[in-house]
Amino acid sequence: MKGFACLALLALAVPAAAQEVASAGGAILRALDKNTGITEDLDVLAGGSVDFGRLNVTVSDCRYPVDDPTSNAFAHLDIADRRSGKTEFSGWMVAASPALSALDDPRYDVWLLRCKTS
């Protein structure tokens, strides 16, 4: 039993291997207007912004695993209501888990599809 406990503690002490990531030039997002059912893919350069309905979406950074650029992208987004000026979302969105960190808006959904690598 002591051997198992020591092995478990050793396993916890060894840090997980970090996955190498790269920054992309922008992000591909999908936006949905829940009232009209209209979806639009938004191509946003890093540091740039785009309007969708009453929202203004800004992409600060988009990162992806070097070994697998088509999956597990994550982007830092700021989403503001253009009418009120209120920030609706500010943080990292993860393409593989859109519900993990999502925009909470009664009319619009915005989620990350992938980083723009070309």
Regions inferred by a protein language model and the residue ranges of each:
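N- and C-terminal low-complexity/disordered segments
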Residues: 2-4, 17-118
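Hydrophobic helical h-region of N-terminal Sec-dependent signal peptides
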Residues: 5-10
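N-terminal signal peptide c-region/cleavage motif recognized by signal peptidases
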Residues: 13-15
